[in-house]
């Protein structure tokens, strides 16, 4: 298990210690830096719901550095992003692949960012099947169903024709930040915090 850094802050009552993720949460920042599984999804969903309950009219900044992961876990995060009232600004740092790229594209329109050296990759869902032939057929049918759903949602968020999404996701499709911008997965490629700061200022006015 990786070591989680602690942050010490001075308060009127003395020193207070936070783990780094709790401290980021105070600034309405959530971060995923691993593969997406059920545990990761549950933690992230809880954070999103908490931040919405704190202030539904204030943006949430969602930083993504993930190779992707379990489709059902990613879809649970996606549905929560669409469900809550708060706009979610997504930021790719490092790489966003598979479900990571899917969640990156699912941010609020105009508030989806990539750092300049990030890599983004989309592809079709993968799955292994074993057991009796009838069981394998059922699992294959479910994978095809999820593929269609994911492609339709990606087409919605990128503005690309569904036919193009189907072709591009048939194999691993890698993009730079600028290429992801042209594709419609992100809206801006940023090198510093100025774009995010400009985004936050109107809310404070």
UniProtKB/Swiss-Prot annotation:
Residues of the active site: 98, 123
Coiled-coil regions listed in the entry: none
Keywords associated with the record: Cytoplasm, Hydrolase, Protease, Serine protease
GO MF assignments: ATP-dependent peptidase activity; ATPase binding; serine-type endopeptidase activity
EC class name: hydrolase
EC number: 3.4.21.92
GO CC terms: cytoplasm; endopeptidase Clp complex
Transmembrane domains' residue ranges: none
The protein's name: ATP-dependent Clp protease proteolytic subunit
Organism: Desulfosudis oleivorans (strain DSM 6200 / JCM 39069 / Hxd3) (Desulfococcus oleovorans)
């Amino acid at each position: 298990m990786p070591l989680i850094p602690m942050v010490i802050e001075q308060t009127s009552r003395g020193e207070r210690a936070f783990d780094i993720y709790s401290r980021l949460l105070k600034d309405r920042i959530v971060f995923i830096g691993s593969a997406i599984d059920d545990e990761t999804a549950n933690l992230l969903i809880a954070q999103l719901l908490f931040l919405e309950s704190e202030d539904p009219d204030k943006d949430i900044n969602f930083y993504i550095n993930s190779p992707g992961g379990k489709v059902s876990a990613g879809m649970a995060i996606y549905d929560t992003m669409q469900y809550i009232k708060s706009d979610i600004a997504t930021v790719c740092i490092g790489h966003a692949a598979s479900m990571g790229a899917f969640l990156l594209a699912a941010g609020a329109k105009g508030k989806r960012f990539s750092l300049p050296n990030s890599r983004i990759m989309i592809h079709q869902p993968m799955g292994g099947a074993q057991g009796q032939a009838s069981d394998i057929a059922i699992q294959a049918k479910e994978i095809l169903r999820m593929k269609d759903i994911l492609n339709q949602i990606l087409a919605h968020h990128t503005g690309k024709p569904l036919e193009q999404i189907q072709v591009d996701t048939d194999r691993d499709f890698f993009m730079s930040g600028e290429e992801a911008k042209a594709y419609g997965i992100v809206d801006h490629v940023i090198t510093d915090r100025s774009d995010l700061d400009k985004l936050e200022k109107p809310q404070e006015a």
